[in-house]
Regions:
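Long, acidic, intrinsically disordered low-complexity segments
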Residues: 1-17
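Mg2+-dependent prenyl diphosphate-binding active-site environment of isoprenoid biosynthetic enzymes
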Residues: 9, 13, 22, 26-269
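Conserved small/polar residues in nucleotide/adenosyl-binding loops
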Residues: 271-273
């Protein structure tokens, strides 16, 4: 099995893990479950839960305690996309080739679906305490997700991103946005995998640095695709950054240099191994 086949196989397995933890669509309030499940199952690379599991395996983890955390991190990521697509933010109608949650279910349900996913993510993550593993590791993992998803992580980056709309920003501020908005959840994913497997503090710190570099390279690549891809290929509107008057690596450095930056940052991440 080559790399691409192995990746496809593990991604499919990860997809099934996430799916098993989604809420049952029943009860008087089942409309919110439908919107939540639609949001999660509308496609995606499942990069964060996949990285979490692979890091867990790398440090010798073999138990099932990782599974609810894998589902939880994907729910947190999805809620952020649902809210990012709202009219008050990027106002996108398509993501992953399908209607965004608010475009399909309405603005109010888009807000509530995102809220529901964030809350249900932690409800799901808490079930890791029932897996018979070290509760201190589980508690540490939950703290990591909470901080990296919150005002000192993803939300903090989103705030500065919103404030920067319509004005030019410098490289330092752009890197701050990218590290928090994109990098923080990737850091959380890999750190949680390491923590649950019993990695040392030094190893967890190294993993965090690697994930930070990966997150920056990932976001720059997304900047490039926003101006070079198509709606059909990318699954979401192109030129969204330009439409929303956002500064990106492409607007600062141009396409050629941005592509070189992706390669350089990716190589830089290897020094932490």
């Amino acid at each position: 099995m080559n790399f691409h086949e192995e990746l496809a196989d593990r991604t499919a397995w990860t997809e099934n893990v996430v799916k098993t933890f989604l809420p049952e669509e029943s009860g008087t309030q089942k409309a919110i479950m439908e919107a939540m499940n639609y949001s999660v199952m509308a496609g995606g690379k499942r990069l964060r839960p996949l990285l979490m599991h692979e890091t867990y395996r790398m440090f010798g983890g073999t138990g099932r305690v990782i599974l609810p955390l894998m589902a939880a991190i994907e729910m947190v990521h999805t809620y952020s996309l649902v809210h990012d697509d709202l009219p008050a933010m990027d106002n996108d109608q398509y993501r992953r080739g399908k209607l965004t949650t608010h475009a399909k279910y309405g603005h109010a349900m888009g807000v509530l679906a995102g809220d529901g996913l964030l809350n249900y993510a932690f409800e799901t993550a808490m079930t890791a305490f029932d897996c018979g593993e070290d509760p201190e590791r589980v508690a540490k993992a939950l703290r990591i997700i909470g901080r990296k998803a919150g005002i000192y992580g993803m939300i903090g980056g989103q705030v500065v991103d919103v404030q920067s709309t319509g004005r030019a920003i410098d490289q330092e501020e752009l890197d701050f946005i990218y590290e928090l908005k994109t990098g923080a959840l990737l850091e959380a994913s890999m750190m949680v995998g390491a923590v649950l497997a019993g990695a040392s503090d030094e190893e967890v710190e190294a993993v965090e640095k690697i994930a930070s570099d990966v997150g920056l390279a990932f976001q720059i690549r997304d900047d490039i695709l926003d101006v070079t891809s198509t709606l059909e290929t990318l699954g979401k509107p192109i030129n969204s950054d330009d439409r929303n008057e956002k500064t990106t690596y492409v607007t600062i450095h141009g396409l050629e240099q941005a592509s070189k930056d992706v390669e350089e940052i990716s190589e830089l991440s290897l020094i932490h191994i």
